[in-house]
C-alpha cells in the first residue's frame, strides 16, 4: 500500500515511523515531512497542507491508498472530505466532526446537551459581558479562545487581574485573530490532568494507553504554557478502573452524540481529562493524535497501525484486536532557547546518532536540513523517547539520550514524569 502522512512535526514523525513497521506499507510519503521522517518516507515539501485540491492531486499522482492526517488545521479545513470525495481512504474526522476541536463552544454545548461531564461554562462574543461574568464568578477561572490557536488559546487565570487581562488579549487585542472573537469561560477544575486517546470508526471505540503531558516550560511546572515539554505513558492516575469510567461516561457517549448530531466521528479522538473528586471530566477534545502524547503512546502499540487505521476508515473496528505492551514510555522534548517566546533557528544539531545508539528513539519536531547537516527550525526541536519495563527505567534511559544531543541554546525539563515517580516514592 502507498500511504501519505500529512504534517511535519514530532507527532507525524512518530506516525510515519509506526506505519513503516507494517508489512502492508510498501511506500510512505510525507507532506511536507521533516529530515527525521526522510528515514522512512519520501518527503514532498512543495505542497500547501491547507490546499485540499493540491493534496488530492498529489494523492492521485502517487496512487495513495491511505491518507493519515496529523495536524488539526487540515482536518477542520475538510481534507478528509476532499479525499473521500475523490475515492481515497483517509484516517481522521471529516470537517463537521473535526468541529469538536475547531470550536470550543460547539464542543461544550455538545457535552452539556448529552450530559458528558465537563466544567461549568458560559460563552461570550462581547468582551464587556465576559468581564462582568468574570467579576461575578471570581478567580481562579479559565478563559479559552473558541477557535484553533495552535494550543496557546487557553489561559488558566489564578487572579481576577489575570482573567481580565486574558479577555483583553483574546477579544480586544485579537491575539488569536478570528479564533478569539468568541470565548468560553469555565470554572477552574481541581485535580490531575491526563490524556486518553482512542481509535474509533464512528461506532466502536478502542481507548489507547493513557498518557500525561507537561505543558509548562520549566521544571516544577513553572513558566509559560507550551505545546508540551514531554510526556509519559501510562499515567498512574488513569487506573484501569478510571479508564473504564472515562470510556463509559465520556468516550462512548461523545461518539454516540456526534453520530446523533449528523457528524459521525472517525479517526483518533483525544480526550484531555481532569481527574477530579467526582471522577473524570473533559478539559477539551482534540480531533487528532496529541503532540507529544503520540510519541509515547504509539511505541507501546504492538498491533499493526495500518490495519487499525483502515478499520477506522472502513467502519470495521469491531473486528480488530488491538494489543498494547505492558511497559512504559517517556518522551523528553528538547527545545530552542527562548521557547515558547521568540527563539533563534538554524543551529546545527550534534549527537543524534549517539542518542539512537543508546537505544532511544529520536523524533524530529522542528528540524531542517542545511548543507547536509540537520539544524534547528522550530521551538520544539526534538522528542527523545525511551521505552522500558517501568517508568523509572524509561525516564533514566530517555535522559541518557537527551544528554547525548547538543545544539546552541538547547533546553529541556529535567523532571518529566515527576508525578508518576512521586507516586512510586509514596508507596
Predicted regions and their residues:
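ATP-binding N-terminal substructure of ATP-dependent carboxylate-amine bond-forming enzymes
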Residues: 1-95
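Solvent-exposed alpha-helices and their adjacent loops that cap or buttress functional pockets
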Residues: 21-23, 36-38, 61, 91, ...
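Short acidic-hydrophobic, aromatic-tinged amphipathic segments that line or gate anion-handling sites
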Residues: 43-50, 122-126, 157
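A conserved helix-loop-beta module that forms one wall/lid of the active-site cleft
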Residues: 91-153
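Internal nucleotide-binding/catalytic subdomain
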Residues: 153-294
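Active-site "cap" helix and flanking loop/linker of ATP-utilizing ligase/carboxylase catalytic domains
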Residues: 247-269, 286-357
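Peripheral (often C-terminal) accessory segments that flank ATP-dependent C-N-forming ligase machineries
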Residues: 311-427
Amino acid at each position: 500500500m502507498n500511504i501519505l502522512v500529512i504534517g511535519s512535526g514530532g507527532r507525524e514523525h512518530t506516525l510515519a515511523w509506526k506505519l513503516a513497521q507494517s508489512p502492508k506499507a510498501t511506500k510512505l510519503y510525507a507532506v511536507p515531512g521533516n529530515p527525521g521522517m526522510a528515514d522512512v518516507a519520501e518527503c514532498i515539501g512543495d505542497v500547501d497542507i491547507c490546499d485540499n485540491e493540491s493534496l488530492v492531486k498529489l494523492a492521485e499522482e502517487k496512487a495513495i491508498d491511505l491518507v493519515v492526517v496529523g495536524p488539526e488545521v487540515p482536518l477542520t479545513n475538510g481534507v478528509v472530505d476532499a479525499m473521500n470525495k475523490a475515492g481515497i481512504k483517509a484516517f481522521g474526522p471529516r470537517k463537521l466532526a473535526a468541529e469538536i476541536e475547531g470550536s470550543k463552544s460547539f464542543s461544550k454545548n455538545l457535552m452539556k446537551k448529552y450530559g458528558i461531564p465537563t466544567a461549568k461554562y458560559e460563552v461570550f462574543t462581547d468582551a464587556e459581558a465576559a468581564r462582568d461574568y468574570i467579576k461575578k464568578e471570581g478567580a481562579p477561572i479559565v478563559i479559552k479562545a473558541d477557535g484553533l490557536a495552535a494550543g496557546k488559546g487557553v489561559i488558566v487565570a489564578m487572579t481576577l487581574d489575570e482573567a481580565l487581562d486574558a479577555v483583553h488579549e483574546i477579544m480586544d487585542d485579537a491575539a488569536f485573530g478570528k479564533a478569539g472573537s468568541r470565548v468560553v469561560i469555565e470554572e477552574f477544575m481541581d485535580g490531575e490532568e491526563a490524556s486518553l486517546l482512542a481509535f474509533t470508526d464512528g461506532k466502536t471505540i478502542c481507548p489507547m494507553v493513557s498518557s500525561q503531558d507537561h505543558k509548562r516550560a520549566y521544571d516544577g511546572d513553572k513558566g509559560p504554557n507550551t505545546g508540551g515539554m514531554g510526556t509519559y505513558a501510562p499515567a498512574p492516575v488513569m487506573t484501569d478502573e478510571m479508564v473504564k469510567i472515562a470510556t463509559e461516561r465520556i468516550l462512548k457517549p461523545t461518539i454516540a452524540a456526534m453520530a446523533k448530531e449528523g457528524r459521525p466521528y472517525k479517526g483518533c479522538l483525544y480526550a484531555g481529562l481532569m481527574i477530579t473528586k467526582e471522577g473524570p471530566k473533559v478539559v477539551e477534545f482534540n480531533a487528532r493524535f496529541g503532540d507529544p502524547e503520540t510519541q509515547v503512546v504509539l511505541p507501546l502499540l504492538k498491533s499493526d497501525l495500518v490495519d487499525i487505521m483502515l478499520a477506522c476508515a472502513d467502519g470495521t473496528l469491531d473486528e480488530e484486536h488491538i494489543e498494547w505492551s505492558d511497559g512504559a514510555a517517556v518522551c523528553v522534548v528538547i527545545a530552542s532557547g527562548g521557547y515558547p517566546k521568540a527563539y533563534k533557528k538554524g543551529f546545527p544539531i550534534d549527537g543524534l546518532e549517539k542518542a539512537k545508539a543508546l537505544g532511544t528513539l529520536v523524533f524530529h519536531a522542528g528540524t531542517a536540513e542545511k548543507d547536509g547537516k540537520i539544524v534547528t527550525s522550530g521551538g520544539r526541536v526534538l522528542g527523545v523517547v525511551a521505552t522500558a519495563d517501568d517508568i523509572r527505567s524509561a525516564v533514566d534511559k530517555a535522559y541518557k539520550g537527551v544528554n547525548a544531543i547538543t545544539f546552541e541554546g538547547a533546553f529541556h525539563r529535567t523532571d518529566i514524569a515527576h508525578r508518576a515517580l512521586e507516586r512510586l516514592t509514596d508507596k
